[in-house]
Every structure is written in structure tokens, then in C-alpha cells.
UniProtKB/Swiss-Prot annotation:
Pfam families: Fimbrial. Belongs to the fimbrial protein family. Transmembrane segments: none annotated. PANTHER family: FIMBRIAL SUBUNIT ELFA-RELATED, FIMBRIN-LIKE PROTEIN FIMI-RELATED. The lineage of its organism: Bacteria, Pseudomonadati, Pseudomonadota, Gammaproteobacteria, Enterobacterales. This is Long polar fimbria protein A. The gene is lpfA. Its main location: other. One of its GO terms (cellular component) is pilus. Keywords: Fimbrium, Signal.
Length: 178
């Protein structure tokens, strides 16, 4: 009888361990973050255009021999969707952020440790015209449905001497309609 009792206790102990393991394997938690915005505008910005990263890549220092020298351009776009052009037919886009200290029409690269100096970032519209930081705008005629706004960006030398380092920056874009 004692042997049978030990066998039952062992079986119940094993079952408790297996049950706990199974329960632990099934438990878990997490967080779901919802973001969005309700707007009163002729178009909405496509979700894939709201937060973008434009990779300017590694650029050799020796291409910057004088103020105004540029790296190769990297394209990016802002997609507008569900455009209703019954009351507004044009969109103005401006870019806002920290302007370069030597050329305020350009975006300043971040000044953290290890940052490059002597360069800013230029943003150009589809006609290759510089959209001046904080003061400029590009205007595009809207199409019903979807309108894609095409831009390019590149590094621009703001000093005769450019130092190596990170060339990161961030800007906001703002839309206004007419």
C-alpha cells in the first residue's frame, strides 16, 4: 500500500509540474499602440509617407572641395491619398527643422559627438529647386484620388573644409492647401 501511495503522490507531482509548464507556456502579454489623426483636409498623407527614413549613405569626404559641392541625390516621396479637389486644387509643402548655421536654407546635421561638420542637407522638389528650410515651400497641383510629391535630398558643403562623421538630421513636413 505504501508503494502504491508513493506512486500516486509521484504521479500527482509530475502532473502538477506538467500543468504548470503548460500554463506558463501559454501565458504572455504585450502592448498594442494605436496612432492616427482625424483631419479636415482635401487629402490624407499615406501611412507609408508619414514617418520616413531617407538613407543618404556613406559619402566620400573628397567630393566636397568647395562650398556648395553636393553629394549624389537620393529620392523620396510623399503620397497623398483620397484627394478631393472640389474646393482645393493645390498643395504647398514646407519643411521645418533646424537650419544649418552657415546656410539656413539647408537642414543642419545633428551636432552630437561624432557628427560631420561643414555640411548640411538640401531638399529639392521635382524641378530640382531647393526648398528652403523653414521658409520655402513647393507647390503641386493635386490630382483627384492620389497625388505623389517627388523630392530628392543630398549633402551640401557649407564650409571649405568638411570633417567626417555622422550626417543625420530630422525635419517635419507641413501641408497647406489652396
Amino acid at each position: 500500500m505504501e508503494f502504491l501511495m508513493k506512486k500516486v503522490v509521484f504521479a500527482l507531482s509530475a502532473l502538477a509540474v506538467v500543468s504548470t509548464s503548460a500554463f506558463a507556456a501559454e501565458s504572455g502579454d504585450g502592448t498594442i499602440k494605436f496612432t492616427g489623426e482625424i483631419v479636415d483636409a482635401p487629402c490624407v498623407v499615406s501611412t507609408d509617407s508619414q514617418n520616413q527614413e531617407v538613407v543618404l549613405g556613406q559619402v566620400k569626404k573628397n567630393i566636397f572641395k568647395a562650398i556648395g559641392d553636393k553629394s549624389s541625390s537620393k529620392p523620396f516621396q510623399i503620397k497623398l491619398e483620397d484627394c478631393d479637389i472640389t474646393s482645393n486644387t493645390k498643395v504647398n509643402v514646407s519643411f521645418n527643422g533646424v537650419g544649418d548655421t552657415d546656410d539656413a536654407t539647408l537642414v543642419s546635421v545633428n551636432t552630437e559627438a561624432g557628427a560631420a561638420t561643414g555640411v548640411g542637407i538640401g531638399i529639392y522638389d521635382n524641378a530640382n529647386k531647393l526648398v528652403e528650410m523653414n521658409t520655402g515651400k513647393s507647390t503641386t497641383t493635386l490630382a483627384a484620388g492620389q497625388t505623389v510629391l517627388y523630392y530628392t535630398a543630398n549633402y551640401v558643403a557649407t564650409k571649405d573644409t568638411v570633417t567626417t562623421g555622422y550626417g543625420n538630421a530630422e525635419v517635419d513636413f507641413n501641408l497647406s492647401y489652396e
